[in-house]
Amino acid sequence: NIGAAGQPPRIKNSLHSHFTAEVFMIHEGTFEIYWGLDSESRTVLSEGDVVSIPTRCFRGFENVGEQYGFLFTVLGGDDTGGVEWAPKVFEAAEEHGLVLLEEHGVWDTHKAPIPDGACRVKVMSQEEASNYDTYTEAEMEHRISRIENLVYQTNAPLSSGSYGSIGHLRVIGLEESVIPGGDGFEMNLMTADQGGGVQMHSRKE
């Protein structure tokens, strides 16, 4: 369940939630990640930074840099169960004439009337949405791996060799990782000098 999003500066991704954990890894640019029913908490991530957003927590992101930005997304588990949108997303869409229909997807009412018999996707009530979890910025910081704070493993089997040093770090995992607990998968970071490579080796995983 690996995806990606590319966005020009000042473009936002609307508040949503998943049924499994969602991980953002910044590949290019600078993004502001925000969460909570009213986007009340936020933090800025740069290239190489990783954040794991828990389930039952509305989240979104905006490219706050000056260049085109690109991030990878990873969802835990084999079945992510879909996506839920915050009520304010539907309200904002309707201001522009957009509605979400069960069989037709996003429908622009400025271009054509809603087809006869079409059903709108049920919108979560404000009361239901208010029961979703939120986290302070300090709490979310424990679920963030920042590139400038990384300390690579000193006993990694790839730390030396004829191809040059290769740094290894377990970003997400069940143990000995920057973001502990696991999200249904592991994420490892490896760095090498340009032109480097690895010889045959094995790992306990």
Where do the protein language model's features map onto the residues?
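Ligand-binding pocket scaffold of soluble enzyme catalytic domains
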Residues: 1-3, 11, 24, 32-35, ...
